[in-house]
Amino acid sequence: MTKLWYLALALFVGTGLHAQSGKPAQPQDRREAEYYVSLYARHYRVPVPLVRAIIQRESNWRPCAVSAKGAKGLMQLMPETARRLGVKESCNINQNISGGVRYLAWLMRLFHNDFRLVAAGYYAGEDIVARRGLSYRNADVIAYVKKMRATYVLEAGVADDFGKTTSKRVMR
């Protein structure tokens, strides 16, 4: 019963439950991560709030987080995706964010800046989402996209429909 209560509390507060392990985030790790989020988001033209929302949801800002499925690091890159993006050390904050933001930029081009599809593709893989689009009806993916939208809106500080946007306000 106590474990169930903690799980419910964690879901309510919005911690990154996808990552099951990894040392707690340290303040210096968060500062370093924020630096690279800003750097790579600008470089790849990805909205900073989207990157922050992914990190919050995926790892709760833990640099060495590892999920039950094997995704690693702040942005929870799967090993195959990390290799494809040239990320050799997933616990390396710079490499993980660089690869993760590059992947988000690629997904944004693939899905024409529709953040719902970008989030779904990030979570489930781009192939299935590219084939089925918004008709993809996996309950886990739908729940993930809803949580990402809520986290994104908090990060961006705007009421956004989580659809297409290239607003300079969110490109900070």
Regions found by a protein language model. Name each.
Residues 6-16:
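Bacterial N-terminal signal peptides
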Residues 20-172:
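Catalytic glycan-binding domains that act on GlcNAc-containing polysaccharides
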Residues 1-5:
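Positively charged n-region of N-terminal signal peptides that target proteins for export
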